[in-house]
């Protein structure tokens, strides 16, 4: 974890903050929950009042991203950053190459694993299993098995999701050229474009707003948040974060169940008392 030699160095860095990126599951929201805590809501609203932009950076597709009453995010980075919007403007759009989509589906079939694919507007699957069902249940959604699955394969696919254990991860990308794993759960994976990721998307959002890396901070907990935390001036790991995330973080706050974001922002004078 990065350390600061004195309080003035930390204070100067915090005073630069103009934009903050938040993961959802395990960061803004406790796993399996649908609503943020009152303190988290208070923190987000206070940041907006103080002129700091707030953004979601999540592995979730757009249609599964929850809206929180009274909170308006300035930008949303969905599909682990493969599709980003700032207000009504598309800032980044990076689908998985068609040949890789088809190869991954072929690999999954050989592994006897159903897959779910996400376009900008829809999520459809060619089947379901316990791991995929439980994965979707974390976001309080159901797997949508569609007879029109093959039609959606021909559209822009921004993310592929499937149940997949650690051993199976070695094989799911065989034969692909421009796809990579973005995993944050041990029983399933997200697959995104190789040039995608939350970190790449954050760079594009910062360019859109004409902010520097040093003017941004981010909060995350999963391994798919690592590049995000390294793409900002100060990446903060949640207390409940994976050890790999804590190792690269500039700082660590309390866990999501203990209102870690609220108390951290309060301690850094980024939100009002």
Q: What residues fall within each predicted segment?
A:
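Non-catalytic pre-domain segments flanking phosphatase-related domains
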Residues: 1-22, 49
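Short, hinge-like loop/turn segments at secondary-structure boundaries
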Residues: 71-75, 94-95, 131-136, 200, ...
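Short, structured coil segments at secondary-structure junctions
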Residues: 71-72, 80, 175-178, 231-232, ...
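Mg2+-dependent phosphoryl-transfer enzymes with acidic/Ser/Thr/Gly-rich catalytic loops
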Residues: 10, 14-19, 191-273
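Conserved acidic, metal-coordinating active-site core of Asp-based
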Residues: 107, 111-231, 240
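Active-site phosphate-binding/coordination module
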Residues: 31, 38-131
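Short hydrophobic/aromatic-enriched beta-strand-loop microsegments
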Residues: 73-81, 94, 137, 181-184, ...
């Amino acid at each position: 974890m990065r350390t600061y030699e004195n309080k003035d160095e930390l204070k100067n860095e915090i005073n630069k903050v103009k934009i903050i990126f938040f993961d959802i599951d395990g960061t803004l929201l406790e796993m399996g929950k649908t609503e943020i805590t009152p303190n988290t809501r208070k923190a987000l609203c206070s940041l907006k009042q103080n002129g700091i932009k707030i953004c979601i950076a999540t592995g979730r597709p757009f249609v599964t991203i929850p809206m929180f009453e009274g909170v308006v995010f300035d930008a949303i980075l969905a599909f682990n950053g493969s599709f980003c919007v700032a207000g009504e403007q598309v800032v980044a759009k990076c689908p998985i190459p068609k040949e890789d989509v088809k190869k991954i589906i072929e690999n999954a079939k050989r592994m006897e694993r159903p897959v779910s694919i996400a376009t900008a507007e829809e999520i459809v699957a060619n089947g379901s299993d316990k791991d995929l069902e439980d994965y979707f249940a974390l976001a309080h959604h159901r797997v949508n098995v569609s007879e029109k699955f093959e039609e959606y394969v021909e559209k822009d696919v921004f993310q592929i999701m499937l149940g997949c254990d650690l051993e199976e991860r070695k094989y799911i990308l065989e034969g692909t050229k421009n796809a990579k794993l973005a995993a944050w759960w041990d029983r399933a994976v997200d697959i995104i474009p190789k040039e995608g990721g939350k970190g790449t998307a954050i760079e594009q959002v910062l360019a859109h707003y004409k902010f520097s890396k040093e003017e941004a901070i981010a909060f995350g907990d999963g391994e798919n948040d690592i590049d995000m935390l390294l793409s900002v001036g100060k990446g903060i790991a949640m207390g409940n974060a994976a050890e790999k995330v804590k190792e690269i973080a500039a700082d660590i706050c309390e866990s999501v169940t203990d209102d870690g974001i609220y108390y951290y922002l309060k301690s850094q004078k980024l939100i009002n008392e």
